[in-house]
């Protein structure tokens, strides 16, 4: 795995200007609300073992189950009695968060420095049938899918099939219903500096998506909703799903394979991520939670089924329109292991890893305190630098954060698109306090040390 210099690490979220850019400082995350942590320790890296759901206290008006997936006995770094108490506190934290933020159901995973893991769940995967969420429940990854698309592109760069400076228009298939400025490069698509407008922000697209929720969209269908450019190429940072939809098409043309196949063959299968799949091109690999949206994050809020009345989300129209920008789904354990492998240097070669971890820019109008690189967000949480990505799609929201200095990885997936999962990540981080968990050994691999912008 890649060795990341401790003084070099500092995290951020979307966007970046291009190779050779000076990294920007990134302030600590300013939480909009707080969830009281229950204090303690933790970390893991092997898939958690399934456990039966156990009931958890909940308000009488909306009883909701919780399920914990204990890790194997640690190798000696954390005493067994301390680990049991730690896992109890982790479960209590997500139970409290689910109630406080009016989330129907959620799943979370923590990977510890000693190679063990914990996965837990709380609430319901399907409210109408009172189907409990478990660690094996899958949720839509939404924009966390961008980390997979970016990884495929960077692998192709490692292999010499693509270059960061390639004009995107020369790598895209012909006949797309969009004009791509010849100055836009692959690097600009990766770091959101292309200036292209986001098709999902076009107010005309939502009624069309919901009119026929079962329809499978093509990239061309989605690209018809791209508006006028927001800026000249390379001049400003604008988060845009259009960039990653185009990157998926570039990867397909460069290899002659569908993006679903590329993600499966290059990333999921080699890493053993069997409960993750590309929804736009594969069948489900795990039970998928229903998605919900609520009108309030107050504890008394009642989840409302989505527009089709079934509660099933996301709509096929939405996930197929998302393509390389947001079509994957999977478990909290899978996305946590993915993040650890990606940022640890186990997915990309030396060139790709160096690119991924070295080029960030501070963002505006996006997420507080976040800098963005080539499909990776950098963010300091309570002074702990992290790398990862967040995601939100109709009915779902989640986040994954890898803390290389602390040796921790934390993921949270929910089936409610309003509540901020970053608040739960922060609460879990406070529970697994690095001050009480033995420090991890430095990550090492044949890849060169990479730098991340210093946290501000």
Predicted regions, residues:
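Extracellular mucin-like PTS domains
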Residues: 34-67, 71-73, 451
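N-terminal export and membrane-targeting signals
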Residues: 1-5
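C-terminal region of N-terminal signal peptides and the immediate post-cleavage residues
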Residues: 9-33, 40-41, 46
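Short, surface-exposed loop or secondary-structure junction motifs
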Residues: 124-126, 179-392
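Short, well-ordered beta-strand elements
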Residues: 386-389, 397-416
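Short active-site loop at a secondary-structure junction
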Residues: 101-104, 128-189, 229-243, 323, ...
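Short, conserved catalytic-motif segment at the N-terminal edge
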Residues: 82-139, 161, 384
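Short, gly/Ser/Thr-rich active-site loops of penicillin-recognizing serine hydrolases
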Residues: 361, 416-456
């Amino acid at each position: 795995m890649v060795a990341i210099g401790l003084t070099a690490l500092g995290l951020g979220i979307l966007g970046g200007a291009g190779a050779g850019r000076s990294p920007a400082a990134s302030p600590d995350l300013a939480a909009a609300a707080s969830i009281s942590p229950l204090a303690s320790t933790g970390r893991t890296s092997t898939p958690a073992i399934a456990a039966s759901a156990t009931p958890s206290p909940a308000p009488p008006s909306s009883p909701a189950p919780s399920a914990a997936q204990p890790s194997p006995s640690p190798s000696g770094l954390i005493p067994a009695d301390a680990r049991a108490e730690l896992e109890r506190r982790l479960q209590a934290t997500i139970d409290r968060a689910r109630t406080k933020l009016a989330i129907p159901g959620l799943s979370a995973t923590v990977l510890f420095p000693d190679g063990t893991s914990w996965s837990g769940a709380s609430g319901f995967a399907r409210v109408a049938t009172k189907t409990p969420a478990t660690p094996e429940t899958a949720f839509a990854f939404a924009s966390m899918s961008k980390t997979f698309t970016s990884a495929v592109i960077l692998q192709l760069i490692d292999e010499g099939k693509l270059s960061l400076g390639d004009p995107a228009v020369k790598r895209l298939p012909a006949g797309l219903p969009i004009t791509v400025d010849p100055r836009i490069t692959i690097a600009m698509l990766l770091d959101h500096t292309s200036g292209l407008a986001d098709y999902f922000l076009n107010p005309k697209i939502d009624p069309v998506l919901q009119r026929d929720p079962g329809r499978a969209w093509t990239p061309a269908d989605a690209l018809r909703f791209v508006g006028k450019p927001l800026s000249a190429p390379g001049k400003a940072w604008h988060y845009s799903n259009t960039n990653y939809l185009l990157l998926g098409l570039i990867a397909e043309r460069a290899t002659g394979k569908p993006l679903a196949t590329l993600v499966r063959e290059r990333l999921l299968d080699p890493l053993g991520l069997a409960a993750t799949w590309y929804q736009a091109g594969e069948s489900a690999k795990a039970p998928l939670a229903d998605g919900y949206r609520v009108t309030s994050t107050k504890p008394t809020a009642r989840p409302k089924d989505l527009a089709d009345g079934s509660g099933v989300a996301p709509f096929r129209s939405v996930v197929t329109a998302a393509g390389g920008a947001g079509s994957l789904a999977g478990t909290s354990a899978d996305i946590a292991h993915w993040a650890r492998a990606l940022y640890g240097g186990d997915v990309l070669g030396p060139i790709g890893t160096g690119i991924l971890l070295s080029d960030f820019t501070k963002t505006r109008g996006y997420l507080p305190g976040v800098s963005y690189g080539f499909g990776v967000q950098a963010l300091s949480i309570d002074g702990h630098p992290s790398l990862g990505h967040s995601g939100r799609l109709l009915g779902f929201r989640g986040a994954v954060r890898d803390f290389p200095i602390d040796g921790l990885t934390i993921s949270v997936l929910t089936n409610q698109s309003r509540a901020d999962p970053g608040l739960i990540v922060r609460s879990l981080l406070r529970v697994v306090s690095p001050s009480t968990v033995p420090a991890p050994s430095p990550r090492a691999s044949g890849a060169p040390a990479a730098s991340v912008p210093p946290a501000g």
